[in-house]
A protein has these predicted regions:
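ATP/NTP-dependent adenylation/nucleotidyl-transfer catalytic domains that generate, transfer
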Residues: 1-134
Length: 134
């Protein structure tokens, strides 16, 4: 997340929802309503922090399907990094990078607004990692 960008606000409705699930929910809304309530162009748009022209998240991060599978195993399932990597079908270097990013960005999660807890292990209340740990 971008500090003071998508973390700004008083209430974060999708705080505890994985990126792949957000897209699935948007598609569900459109199917359920029988019309395009959420534009398909928005749903299918490549993820970007939009900090600079042409920036795409998947140029610097694993694909969200891999990232979400890893996080569901590592955070929600409290599995080891190795087991989470197997589940997400990613290599050790990618798994180590994801874990580093999780720990390095703890300070952002501490500053983000409150939101509903939907998973078994939500960042914040159920997941605490020292912000100064190396």
């Amino acid at each position: 997340s971008t500090l003071y960008g998508d973390t700004a606000g008083a209430f974060a409705l999708i705080k505890d929802v994985y990126k792949t699930d957000v897209r699935a929910l948007a598609r569900f809304v459109n199917r359920h309503r029988g019309r395009e309530v959420i534009p398909d162009a928005l749903i299918n748009r490549p993820p970007s922090a939009e900090l600079r022209e042409g920036q795409l998240d998947e140029a610097s991060f694993p694909k969200y399907a891999v990232l979400d599978a890893f996080l569901k195993a590592y955070v929600d399932g409290r599995q080891s990094m190795e087991d989470a990597a197997d589940r997400a079908r990613c290599d050790r270097a990618t798994a180590e990078r994801i874990v580093r990013l999780i720990h390095r960005n703890e300070y952002k999660r501490r500053q983000s607004p409150t939101g509903p807890k939907l998973s078994g292990t939500a960042f914040g209340r159920d997941w605490r990692y020292p912000m100064t740990a190396k």
